[in-house]
C-alpha cells in the first residue's frame, strides 16, 4: 500500500513540475512578443535579439546590459514593474494568472523574482540590475524545475 501511495505522490509532483514549466512557456512566449517593440529603445543588437528566443537554453548567457534595458521596456508594456523598476507583485500575479493554469505558477514566480531583486538591490543602474535579476531568476527557475524547454515555448508561441 505504501509503495502505491509513494508512486501516486511522485506522479503528482512530476505532473505539477511539468504543469508549471508549461505555464512558464506561455508566459515566456507572450512576454517575448514585446521584444521587437523594445529593440530600438533598449539598444539591443540584432544578434542578441535573435538569441533572446533561447533565453532558457544553457547556452544563452544573461549578461548584456542592453538585455536588462529591453526587459524593463517589455515589462512596462504589461505594467509589471513599479516606478522604481522593481516587480509590481499584484500586476505580475495577475499577468501570470491570465495564462492557462497560471495560478499554479504565479506565487512561485513572483517569489523567485522578488528574492533575486533583493540580492541585487544595491545596483543603481536599472538595466544592469535587471539583467542580474533576470540571470538569477533563470538559474533559480531551473533549480525549481519551472523553466520551460525551448521546444515548449516554440509550441505555444503562435498563440500570441
From Swiss-Prot:
Residues 1-19 form the signal peptide. One of its GO terms (biological process) is sensory perception of smell. The keyword Disulfide bond applies. Disulfide bonds join 38-73, 69-127, 116-136. Pfam families: PBP_GOBP. Antenna. InterPro entries: Odorant/phero-bd_Lep, PBP/GOBP, PBP_GOBP_sf. Coiled coil: none annotated. It comes from the Eukaryota. GO terms for molecular function: odorant binding. The keyword Signal applies. Present in the aqueous fluid surrounding olfactory sensory dendrites and are thought to aid in the capture and transport of hydrophobic odorants into and through this fluid. Belongs to the PBP/GOBP family. This is General odorant-binding protein 2.
Amino acid at each position: 500500500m505504501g509503495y502505491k501511495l509513494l508512486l501516486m505522490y511522485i506522479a503528482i509532483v512530476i505532473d505539477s513540475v511539468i504543469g508549471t514549466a508549461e505555464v512558464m512557456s506561455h508566459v515566456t512566449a507572450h512576454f517575448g512578443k514585446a521584444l521587437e517593440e523594445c529593440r530600438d529603445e533598449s539598444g539591443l543588437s540584432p544578434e542578441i535579439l535573435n538569441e533572446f528566443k533561447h533565453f532558457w537554453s544553457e547556452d544563452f548567457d544573461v549578461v548584456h546590459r542592453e538585455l536588462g534595458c529591453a526587459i524593463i521596456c517589455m515589462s512596462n508594456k504589461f505594467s509589471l514593474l513599479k516606478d522604481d523598476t522593481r516587480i509590481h507583485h499584484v500586476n505580475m500575479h495577475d499577468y501570470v494568472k491570465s495564462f492557462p493554469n497560471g495560478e499554479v505558477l504565479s506565487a512561485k514566480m513572483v517569489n523567485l523574482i522578488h528574492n533575486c531583486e533583493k540580492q541585487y538591490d544595491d545596483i543603481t543602474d536599472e538595466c544592469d540590475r535587471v539583467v542580474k535579476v533576470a540571470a538569477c531568476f533563470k538559474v533559480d527557475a531551473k533549480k525549481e524545475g519551472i523553466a520551460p524547454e525551448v521546444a515548449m515555448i516554440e509550441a505555444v508561441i503562435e498563440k500570441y
